[in-house]
């Protein structure tokens, strides 16, 4: 685990402990069951994909550790509607506060504004967070193999299935791709960002895609800015892309989304 992930995992465990002290497992399970029915995240990606076209997971992200503040004019419901109008298949909403200036309410309000499935983009270190994610309205969770072991990853994925959610399993290298396959992942994200240097290289997806589980839907993440990038990633066999910063920096998010997908 890199230093940055170790720091995030440490504060996230403290945060989860505090949240669990306020809401028992029974209480969070009840809230999850009371939430509106899950929207099929993976199914939406499959439905939007076509030859020469990657499905888009459009990200609502205010800031990041590497880039700082990304968008000052930040209104999650407005951005969600802009992405939907631009043709996005799904949304990704950052809820981590310390590193990304995210908030749980961003997910709640963004999902309420649209009909798109939403993934909660956060750092999961406890199965309790899966039920919490469903209670917030999330249709999918992110499982980052670089910061957890396979036992916890399997628990998170199992809990997601129990609640009718999809799990996007994120990998960064060959070893993690092998782990994703062993875990039976059917939705795998390849992050093109090096977690130590923060350097982004689309060649990561080109290198790892051939090792992806045969039946998994492959998502390429980070570093996609132009339609040429999309064409390059489509050639790897990826069916979807997760894009945040390049769209969030545009004044006209809808037009930028359409241009990227077209």
Curated annotation (Swiss-Prot):
<keyword id="KW-0822">Tryptophan biosynthesis</keyword>
<comment type="similarity">
    <text>Belongs to the TrpC family.</text>
</comment>
<comment type="pathway">
    <text>Amino-acid biosynthesis; L-tryptophan biosynthesis; L-tryptophan from chorismate: step 4/5.</text>
</comment>
<keyword id="KW-0028">Amino-acid biosynthesis</keyword>
<dbReference type="InterPro" id="IPR045186">
    <property type="entry name" value="Indole-3-glycerol_P_synth"/>
</dbReference>
<dbReference type="InterPro" id="IPR001468">
    <property type="entry name" value="Indole-3-GlycerolPSynthase_CS"/>
</dbReference>
<dbReference type="GO" id="GO:0004425">
    <property type="term" value="F:indole-3-glycerol-phosphate synthase activity"/>
</dbReference>
<keyword id="KW-0456">Lyase</keyword>
<dbReference type="Pfam" id="PF00218">
    <property type="entry name" value="IGPS"/>
</dbReference>
<keyword id="KW-0057">Aromatic amino acid biosynthesis</keyword>
<keyword id="KW-0210">Decarboxylase</keyword>
<dbReference type="InterPro" id="IPR013798">
    <property type="entry name" value="Indole-3-glycerol_P_synth_dom"/>
</dbReference>
<dbReference type="InterPro" id="IPR011060">
    <property type="entry name" value="RibuloseP-bd_barrel"/>
</dbReference>
<dbReference type="GO" id="GO:0004640">
    <property type="term" value="F:phosphoribosylanthranilate isomerase activity"/>
</dbReference>
<dbReference type="InterPro" id="IPR013785">
    <property type="entry name" value="Aldolase_TIM"/>
</dbReference>
<protein>
    <recommendedName>
        <fullName>Indole-3-glycerol phosphate synthase</fullName>
        <ecNumber>4.1.1.48</ecNumber>
    </recommendedName>
</protein>
<dbReference type="GO" id="GO:0000162">
    <property type="term" value="P:L-tryptophan biosynthetic process"/>
</dbReference>
